Each structure stands twice: as C-alpha cells, then as structure tokens.
C-alpha cells in the first residue's frame, strides 16, 4: 500500500466493535471522554501504559529532531500494537488534529508512516478534528456530541483543579482522589442516561462538586503554589512531563494546572482564520 493511501474507518468496522486506541494526555478528562465515546458505540481505550519502552518505540519510528510529544504519542500507540493484547485486524487508532500551525497537525501522517514501516498500514487511523481535515464514515463528530464534549471538558477542568487544590492539604490521604473517582462514576452514569450536559444541569452539578471538595478536612497550612504551563501535551501528560505533578506533591507543593477549556478558543481561531481566508483543507 502506498503511503499516500488512507485506510478509512468504516461503519462496518464500528459495527464489528473495533478497539480504538488513543494516547493518554489529561488522565481525569480522558477517563470521562472514554465513557462519552462508549455512549455513542465507540470502543475507545485510552492507553494507560508507562515506561521507557514507550520512548524506545517512538525513537524507532519518529526522527529525534521531531518534537518529544510526537515521539511519545506515536511510541505509546506502537507499543500497544506490539503488546500482543489486541487483534490488529480489529484495531484502529485515533489522534487529534487541530489544523493549526503546530506540527501536531502532522502527527497523524507520522503515525501512518510508522505503521507502514512496520507492515501495519492496514490499521485505520482516525483524525479527531472539527476542521474537516479528514472524514470517516464510521466516525462522526455530531453537534450533540461536541456539546457533550464541552461539558466533559468543564467537568474535567473542575475535578482536576479541585483535586490539585485539595490534595496537598487533605488530612486523610486519598480523600480528594476518591472524590474524583466517585464523581467520574456519577457523571458517567448521568451521561449514559443523556443527563448532565445541559447548562441548567451543569449550573447545579458544578457547585455540588465544589461543595464536596470544600468539605474535605484539610490542615490549613500554607504551601508553595507552582503553576505549570507550556506545550499542551507536556503540560498535562504524566509521561510527557515525567510525573511533574507527583514530583511537586512530593516536594510539599500545591500544583496549579490551567484547564483544557482555555485551549478551545485557540482551535476555534484556527478554524475561523481558514474560513475567513477561504482556504480549503481538501
């Protein structure tokens, strides 16, 4: 198969229950996204793998002059394919593609090149984008799905923020983590019943989440607050930043990581710029 060919993710593949592997980035958010996709019939699995082998796999297929996030995301997916855990003839991959100036828009092509090099070019790679860059008959982002995804981002941002604010001060170790897990389950159950996404519902649920975290017994001491900024993948991904949040926690610090919702206007700006300039992705 020529590298220029693209294997489409078809409706038949969705019906057959293909496993769709996705690299991890923001653990709290992506657990919610995994459940959102499941509610639409997509068997998405967010990869939880860690270890040096991911870097080694990435170095096999991605030039070391390419950015580290590309090496890690592609390495994590190739490592999963080589694990023997999946039926490679019923497996697909998914990766985001913003369409902006960042080289992240080209990760998908680097991934397909890696698959071709490894003799796995028959595995479909889905582009997760809102810019019309690529389309697949078996995977579609609908307006209701996008609206729900924005809700997931809001919930994920709040859970991440409150967990980071509470964990360094909690009297009972693990109390804030338990709240994250409990609310993830509650939200998942709501999503399955088509609830929890409307503005009216969120106006009720978001304060409930905040109240639960506010009720966690804390020590009240003052600690150094450390903000984490930078490239989006490295900022959120534990394997991208060498578990920076855990390291800061071990150093008696409170971590502040900005929410993912703040990235959405950037993606929207890319889309509007292309529309205004009448540039086609075709």
Predicted regions and their residues:
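An N-terminal assembly and electron-transfer interface module characteristic of large anaerobic redox
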Residues: 1-275, 280
């Amino acid at each position: 198969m020529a590298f220029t060919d693209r294997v489409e993710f078809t409706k038949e593949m969705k019906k057959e229950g293909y496993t769709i592997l996705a690299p991890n980035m923001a653990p709290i958010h992506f657990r919610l996204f995994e459940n959102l996709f499941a509610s639409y019939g997509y068997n998405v699995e967010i990869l939880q793998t860690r270890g040096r082998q991911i870097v080694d796999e990435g170095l096999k297929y991605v030039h070391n002059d390419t950015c580290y996030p590309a090496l890690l995301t592609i390495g994590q997916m190739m490592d999963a394919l080589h694990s023997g855990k999946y039926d490679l003839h019923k497996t697909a991959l998914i990766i985001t593609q913003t369409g902006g100036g960042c080289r992240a828009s080209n990760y998908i092509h680097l991934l397909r090149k890696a698959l071709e090099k490894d003799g796995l070019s028959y595995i479909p790679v889905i582009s997760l984008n809102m810019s019309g860059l690529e389309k697949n008959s078996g995977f579609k982002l609908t307006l209701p799905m996008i609206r729900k995804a924005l809700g997931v981002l809001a919930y994920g941002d709040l859970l991440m923020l409150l967990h980071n604010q509470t964990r360094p001060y909690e009297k009972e170790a693990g109390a804030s983590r338990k709240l994250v897990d409990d609310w993830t389950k509650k939200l998942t159950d709501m999503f399955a019943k088509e609830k929890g996404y409307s503005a009216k519902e969120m106006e009720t649920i978001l304060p409930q989440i905040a109240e639960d975290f506010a009720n966690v017994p804390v020590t009240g001491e003052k600690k150094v607050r450390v903000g984490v900024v930078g490239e989006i993948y490295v900022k959120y991904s534990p394997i991208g930043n060498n578990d920076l949040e855990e390291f800061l926690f071990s150093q008696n610090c409170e971590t502040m990581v900005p929410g993912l919702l703040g990235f959405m206007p950037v993606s929207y700006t890319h889309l509007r710029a292309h529309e205004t300039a009448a540039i086609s992705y075709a």
